[in-house]
Curated annotation (Swiss-Prot):
Family label: Belongs to the TGF-beta family.
CDD domains listed in its UniProt record: TGF_beta_GDF5_6_7
Residues cleaved off as propeptide: 23-350
Biased composition (Basic and acidic residues): 45-80
Alphabetized UniProt keyword annotations: Apoptosis, Cleavage on pair of basic residues, Cytokine, Developmental protein, Disulfide bond, Glycoprotein, Growth factor, Secreted, Signal
Gene Ontology annotations of biological process type: apoptotic process; BMP signaling pathway; fat cell differentiation; positive regulation of chondrocyte differentiation; positive regulation of p38MAPK cascade; positive regulation of SMAD protein signal transduction
Glycosylation sites per record: 120
Species this chain originates from: Bos taurus (Bovine)
Signal sequence range: 1-22
SUPFAM superfamilies: Cystine-knot cytokines
One Gene Ontology cellular component annotation held by this UniProt entry: extracellular space
Name of the protein: Growth/differentiation factor 6
PROSITE patterns: TGF_BETA_1 (PS00250), TGF_BETA_2 (PS51362)
Localisation: Secreted
Length: 470
């Protein structure tokens, strides 16, 4: 009973004191002092260089962001240049793969068919009795400073021509496109004239009909006279057009046209501009030459030499690794036998080729001398990077024994008959005569030379037609 009264009295006393203003101010001042104490501690920590400790989860979340490096800028990506590597299937030391001109392909097809029919390609009038035809693609640009185009220059790098070759002809082939707009009223006869650059020498001139729109086609100019005096490094030819029938009408082009003299026609309107042209429509210089037999395979030596000089055994630049091992020595009595050896980078292919085609030579055949098959694949030899066509052909070879008596179809020489007779009497004293080719025929090869020019060449004595004892 006394306890309940004491508790009730305490409650009334507390409520009475809470209503007094002095007690409320004391409580407020105590709470504010605690707040000021907290703020003072915070300011003191800032002055001393210490930041208030944040919650742990915030620190751990922010710490990886502070340590993480900023990502690279997107615009910096294109500035990174990948290491330059030669493209696949490109011959060493060359530029991009050369696309043969359709004109050179047609020459190869025509002369190859003639050879199969037994006709020598050098007898064709178009070949000019040449066994080598080299094509050079125009490297010039349009002269944009002259509008309209009055003169068109054509530049050709002819440094790969050898002074050992006899030059028998040269022609410039220009593709004339159909004009985009019809011609205006004719001002007289229209003539095309071809000059050597920086020279008044007129190589050839021809007339065009100004009445009708010309059809697209090839204009062929004889430039043999312009190529002969050149030092065979670079040939520059210039095409002009003029109104008039005189051969030197184009020379009056530099004069200011009078009231009765129309300006020279625009070569672009005649279809001779370089813009919007396919590779097959570019100007082509075709040189006809006749090579001596001893220099027919000189380009093979150049091909193998340029490949070993430019690229090392590991595919890197020159000097990046140890030099390649020397090629095997040629067989005795065989001149330039190393020309038929594939490049160092093709040795695995050569080994496979030899193991596949050399099994029949393990045992000496006792058959009489006759012609046997021999299939040659230039791709297996490693020459497909510069030989365009053919990639393979049937060469044949001679195999067998020349025993006594010799057959008449073997066409033996008197010396072979005596040698065979001596061998039959005493095999230890005299070796038998040899089974060798007695008649060989040529083949046509289309290839890329060291200057990336497409060349047609007729190679003599490439196919065995008959065998005999010698």
């Amino acid at each position: 009973m006394d306890t309940s009264r004491v508790l009730l009295s305490a409650v009334f006393l507390i409520s009475f004191l809470w209503d007094l203003p002095g007690f409320q101010q004391a409580s407020i001042s105590s709470s504010s002092s605690s707040a000021e104490l907290g703020s003072a501690k915070g300011m003191r920590s800032r002055k001393e260089g210490r930041m208030p400790r944040a919650p742990r989860e915030n620190a751990t979340a922010r710490e990886p962001l502070d340590r993480q490096e900023p990502p690279p800028r997107p615009q910096e990506e294109p500035q990174r240049r990948p290491p330059q590597q030669p493209e696949a299937r490109e011959p060493p030391g060359r530029g991009p793969r050369v696309v043969p001109h359709e004109y050179m392909l047609s020459i190869y097809r025509t002369y190859s068919i003639a050879e199969k029919l037994g006709i020598n390609a050098s007898f064709f009038q178009s070949s000019k009795s040449a066994n080598t035809i080299t094509s050079f693609v125009d490297r010039g640009l349009d002269d944009l400073s002259h509008t309209p185009l009055r003169r068109q220059k054509y530049l050709f790098d002819v440094s790969t021509l050898s002074d050992k070759e006899e030059l028998v002809g040269a022609e410039l082939r220009l593709f004339r496109q159909a004009p985009a707009a019809p011609w205006g009223p004719p001002a007289g006869p229209l003539r095309l004239q071809l000059f050597a650059c920086q020279s008044p020498l007129l190589l050839e001139a021809r007339s065009l009909d100004p009445q009708g729109a010309p059809r697209p086609g090839w204009e062929v100019f004889d430039v043999w006279r312009g190529l002969r005096p050149q030092p065979w490094k670079q040939l520059c030819l210039e095409l002009r057009a003029a109104w008039g029938g005189e051969p030197g009408a184009a020379e009056d082009e530099a004069r200011a046209p009078g009231p009765q003299q129309p300006p020279p026609p625009d070569l672009r309107s005649l279809g001779f501009g370089r813009r919007v042209r396919t590779p097959q429509e570019r100007a082509l210089l075709v040189v006809f030459s006749r090579s001596q037999r001893k220099t027919l395979f000189a380009e093979m030596r150049e091909q193998l030499g340029s490949a070993t000089e430019v690229v090392g055994p590991g595919g890197g630049a020159e000097g990046s690794g140890p030099p390649p091992p020397p090629p095997p020595p040629p067989p005795s009595g065989t001149p330039d036998a190393g020309l038929w050896s594939p490049s160092p980078g093709r040795r695995r292919r050569r080994t496979a080729f030899a193991s596949r085609h050399g099994k029949r030579h393990g045992k000496k055949s006792r058959l009489r001398c006759s012609k046997k098959p021999l299939h040659v694949n230039f791709k297996e030899l490693g020459w497909d990077d510069w030989i365009i066509a053919p990639l393979e052909y049937e060469a044949y070879h001679c195999e067998g024994v020349c025993d006594f008596p010799l057959r008449s179809h073997l066409e033996p020489t008197n010396h072979a008959i005596i040698q065979t007779l001596m061998n039959s009497m005493d095999p230890g004293s005299t070796p038998p005569s040899c089974c060798v080719p007695t008649k060989l025929t040529p083949i046509s090869i289309l290839y890329i030379d060291a200057g990336n020019n497409v060349v047609y060449k007729q190679y003599e004595e490439m196919v065995v037609e008959s065998c005999g004892c010698r």
